[in-house]
């Protein structure tokens, strides 16, 4: 399964991340891309960013997010992703079924 992860710096964090934590986060995410655990990662100008993770469950995503070096410095929004072609086929099939019922 694929998950869109949007991360934003957590406002009011008591402890600020160090340069060492920033580098560890970078290396961890780039390594995840090389291993196929993530498809991509992009930063937002001004802080935060997005990535697309590959995982077998929501629990796996949660574990990976909060075990990352900056896991407690971000607020996360996680959205499961569907294959576009399959999604649109399902919508079209549902509409076709509804159209047949209304005839």
Residue map of PLM features:
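Conserved, structured core segments of small domains
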Residues: 1-103
């Amino acid at each position: 399964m694929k998950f869109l992860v949007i991360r934003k710096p957590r406002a009011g964090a008591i402890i600020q991340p160090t340069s060492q934590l920033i580098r560890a986060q970078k290396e961890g995410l780039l390594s995840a891309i090389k291993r196929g655990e993530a498809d991509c990662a992009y930063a937002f100008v001004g802080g935060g960013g997005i990535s697309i993770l590959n995982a077998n469950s929501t629990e796996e995503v949660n574990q990976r997010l909060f075990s990352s070096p900056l896991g407690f410095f971000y607020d996360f929004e996680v959205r499961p992703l569907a294959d576009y072609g399959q999604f649109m086929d399902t919508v079209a099939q549902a509409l076709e079924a509804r159209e047949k019922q209304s005839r």
